[in-house]
């Protein structure tokens, strides 16, 4: 048999006791017909052995591998639902139970997360400590102002206590491992485009090495760091308000000086101009007198003579340069050096002879004898 013919058999043709139409009577005595029977179609497939043998491999071979992979969880789900359906758990009840389980698990996870966050906050709260900065001017310090150590934010201002004497800014440091040395420089600075106020802490040398933290009871005895709720003094750093005040004072002083001295300066300038007028007249007269002299000097041949003299000096310098180059040849230079060496040697000999003569004539007895000899010779002559 070729193919898989389908034979539809109406269920109405099948023998059934319900197919016998019997008139029925209602309780009030009115007869009525029985309900129309529902027709059911049964599908019967006929297949040969050969088709059954070859049909399965062909259907499996034509499936997409992705479809096969996606069918695996579906088949697992179906296999899981079968035993549950035997105990009265339908598909709807399973979905409702899954939704309820999801809601319960989500609520449990949310509660655990909230408990963990609260525990973390409580643990971090026990590790924080407070310090008080004593300042002469607030300079915009308010709740939330950052506190920095070497440019790193380590805490914030939680409260500001103003008074007529000073300002006390209470800061909360985030971790007790962050210490503030006693010798630190605390400044209130304003920086940035919006001139944000911040408290900068700059530790100075020598950097302390405490053995206990700021929350330890023995912290105050060491005196190396700022302990919990202790006070440290601060100074005013870069302040926009102070800069504006300085420029305002300078402007007022300049304005006062300018208004006071403008009139006196104008009077002095006028007096100087009046005193300079005779001098200007004299300069003008001298210029008029010098103009004829300049014209005569220009018309005379003095300029030409000066030019000739300059040319003569130039030629003389050229001649001297040539003579120098002709005389100071390497041979002449060597001869001059030898002559200088000979002269030096001769002078040394003369010096030795003169020293000998000086040593001979330097004796008193020799001088007397020479005088007597000269006198005797003069008598003989």
From Swiss-Prot:
Result after altering residue 237 to R: In tgd2-2; accumulation of trigalactosyldiacylglycerol
Pfam family membership, one: MlaD
Keywords attached to this entry: Chloroplast, Lipid transport, Membrane, Plastid, Plastid inner membrane, Transit peptide, Transmembrane, Transmembrane helix, Transport
Bilayer-spanning residue ranges: 97-117
MF terms in GO: lipid transporter activity; phospholipid binding
Topology term for the membrane: Single-pass membrane protein
Record carries keyword ATP-binding: no
Main location: plastid
Transit pept. (range): 1-45
Taxonomic superkingdom: Eukaryota
Residues in compartment: Stromal: 46-96
InterPro entries in UniProt: Mce/MlaD (IPR003399), TGD2-like (IPR039342)
Subunit structure: Homomultimer. Substrate-binding subunit of the TGD complex, a lipid translocator at the inner chloroplast envelope membrane made of TGD1, TGD2 and TGD3. Interacts with TGD1 and TGD3 with an overall subunit stoichiometry of 2 TGD1, 2 TGD3 and 8 to 12 TGD2. Interacts with TGD5.
Protein purpose: Component of a phosphatidic acid/lipid transport complex in the chloroplast envelope. Specifically binds phosphatidic acid (PA). Involved in lipid transfer from the endoplasmic reticulum (ER) to plastids, and necessary for thylakoids formation.
UniProt comment concerning the protein's domains: Amino acids 201-225 are sufficient for specific binding of phosphatidic acid.
This protein's name: Protein TRIGALACTOSYLDIACYLGLYCEROL 2, chloroplastic
Species for this entry: Arabidopsis thaliana (Mouse-ear cress)
């Amino acid at each position: 048999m070729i193919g898989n013919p389908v034979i539809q058999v109406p269920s109405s043709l099948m023998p059934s006791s319900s197919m016998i139409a019997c008139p029925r009577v209602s309780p009030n005595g009115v007869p009525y017909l029985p309900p129309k029977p529902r027709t059911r179609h049964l599908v019967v497939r006929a297949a040969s052995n050969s088709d059954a043998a070859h049909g399965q491999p062909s259907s499996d071979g034509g499936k997409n591998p992705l479809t096969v992979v996606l069918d695996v969880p579906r088949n697992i789900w179906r296999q899981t639902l079968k035993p549950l359906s035997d105990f009265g758990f339908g598909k709807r009840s399973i979905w409702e139970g899954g939704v309820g389980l999801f809601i319960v698990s989500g609520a449990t996870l949310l509660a655990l997360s909230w408990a963990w966050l609260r525990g973390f906050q409580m643990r971090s709260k026990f590790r924080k400590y407070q310090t008080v900065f004593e300042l002469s001017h607030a300079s915009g310090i308010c709740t939330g102002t950052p506190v920095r150590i070497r440019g790193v934010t380590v805490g914030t201002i939680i409260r500001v206590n103003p008074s007529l004497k000073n300002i006390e800014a209470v800061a909360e440091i985030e971790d007790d491992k962050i210490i503030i040395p006693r010798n630190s420089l605390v400044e209130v600075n304003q920086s940035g485009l919006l001139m944000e106020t911040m408290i900068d802490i700059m530790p100075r040398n020598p950097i302390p090495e405490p053995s206990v933290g700021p929350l330890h009871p023995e912290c105050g005895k060491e005196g190396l760091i700022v302990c919990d709720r202790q006070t440290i003094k601060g100074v005013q750093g870069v302040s926009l308000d102070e800069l504006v005040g300085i420029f305002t004072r300078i402007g007022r002083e300049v304005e006062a000086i300018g208004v006071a001295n403008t009139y006196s300066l104008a009077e002095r300038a006028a007096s100087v101009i009046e005193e300079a007028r005779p001098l200007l007249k004299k300069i003008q007269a001298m210029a008029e007198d010098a103009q004829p002299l300049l014209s005569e000097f220009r018309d005379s041949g003095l300029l030409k003579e000066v030019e000739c003299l300059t040319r003569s000096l130039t030629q003389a310098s050229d001649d001297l340069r040539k003579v120098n180059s002709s005389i100071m040849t390497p041979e002449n230079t060597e001869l001059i050096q030898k002559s200088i060496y000979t002269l030096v040697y001769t002078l040394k000999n003369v010096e030795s002879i003169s020293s000998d003569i000086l040593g001979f004539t330097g004796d008193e007895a020799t001088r007397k004898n020479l005088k007597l000899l000269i006198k005797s010779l003069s008598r003989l002559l």
